[in-house]
Amino acid sequence: MKRVGFLTSGGDCQALNATMRGVAKGLYQIYKDEVEIIGFEDGYKGLMYANYLMMKQSDFSGVLTKGGTMLGTSRQPFKLMRVPDENGLDKVELMKHTYYKLKLDALVVLGGNGSQKTANLLSQEGLNVIGLPKTIDNDLWGTDMTFGFQSAVDIATNAIDCIHTTASSHGRVFICLLYTSPSPRDGA
């Protein structure tokens, strides 16, 4: 029996559910009934505190076009991963404990820069981790395009097209602010 954990971490974006569905579908095709998928709720928090769902094939039905993440997400700053809690355990030790307690064969992490840094740290600790790059900023080093980016561009373009029509009709100017974070590519 193979046991694979899924978690989504950091900001929300389109295609999280679709990506998990694609990975799950591949696992079920290869391993049939010999695979268990464990979904960690609220990102790395779920892995730290063993908050998880035993997922079934049916959990991945009907999610292809749904945005967001069925598992929930949270932000866990990378720089705090090694800070001990009140019991003297750092977050990495808590995550390793859950990983080994659940006898995972691999952990699939869907996340951006900080989430992938943590995934790399867990890999350096001996865990089998697969990092799937996700960000609407498209600023992850080593990738041409991250999932989430094109959806964000398409939605923003559509909204701006609609606003342009209204602005033209009423002789007004609109200023549109789109969320992004400083990019390492920009020297930030």
Kindly label every feature range from the protein language model.
Residues 1-48:
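N-terminal phosphate-binding or glycine-rich loops at protein starts, especially the Walker A/P-loop
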Residues 3-13, 70-72, 105-109, 174-177:
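Short glycine-rich or small-residue beta-strand-to-loop segments that form or flank ligand, phosphate
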Residues 5, 29-31, 61-65, 98-102, ...:
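Solvent-exposed alpha-helices and their adjacent loops that cap or buttress functional pockets
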Residues 9-12, 40-45, 75-76, 112-115, ...:
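Short, ordered loop/turn segments at secondary-structure junctions
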Residues 19, 23, 113-127:
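Short Gly/Thr/Asp-enriched flexible loops that form oxyanion-binding sites at enzyme active sites
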Residues 50-107, 147-161:
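Glycine-rich oxoanion-binding loops at beta->alpha junctions
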Residues 123-146, 150-153:
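Short, acidic/small-residue loops that bind anionic groups at enzyme active sites
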Residues 179-188:
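Single conserved hydrophobic/aromatic residue that forms the stacking wall/gate
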